[in-house]
From Swiss-Prot:
Residues that coordinate or bind Zn(2+): C74, H77, C145
Assembly mode: Homomer.
EC annotation from Swiss-Prot or TrEMBL: 3.5.4.16
Highest rank taxon of the organism: Bacteria
Signal peptide (residue range): none
Keyword GTP-binding among record annotations: yes
GO BP: one-carbon metabolic process; tetrahydrobiopterin biosynthetic process; tetrahydrofolate biosynthetic process
The name this protein goes by in its record: GTP cyclohydrolase 1
GO annotation, cellular component aspect: cytoplasm
Pathway terms, separated by semicolons: Cofactor biosynthesis; 7,8-dihydroneopterin triphosphate biosynthesis; 7,8-dihydroneopterin triphosphate from GTP: step 1/1
Catalytic activity: GTP + H2O = 7,8-dihydroneopterin 3'-triphosphate + formate + H(+)
Amino acid sequence: MSIDREKLKRSIRLFLEAIGEDPDREGLKETPDRIVRLWEEFKSYENFNMTVFEDIGDYNEMVVVRDIQFYSFCEHHLLPFFGKAHIAYIPEKKVCGLSKLVRVVNKFAYRPQVQERLTAQIAEFLEKELSPKGVAVVLEAEHLCMSMRGVKNPTSYTITSKLTGAFMEDEKTRNEFLNLIHNGR
């Protein structure tokens, strides 16, 4: 779905007026256009298609990409949450380019979202596209809706995980993944 640029610009102007700001003052004049460009950039990731390689030889060990920086917006307050994603999978017959894992995170992060759903969507997408022996996704994030408002606790991080296949069923595999993302620095 594309963005209704004019409707979004009008809405941002109305929002600024509603909170007592002058949308025509210096510093805010271009804000509606900036917001439109931000959301157009975010929406551009929705159409990402995963490139998959099926000739992987005999490789059947864990593939891990950790510390993938991500940004999203809490769907309850429209405030940012951001942090790091750690992703692993064990190939069955398919692999993807490592940068594609970053794009998968962005595909689901760049929208109003909750961290729990984001974690599950990443894992489910990789399961569907790669048919691996297992997928592990851990997200660590600071939520500005907790840091700036409400409890005002800027030192807390939310950690969510989604494990499938070998990562869920085999404690040794799960522990190897957790060790790699926490101690392998």
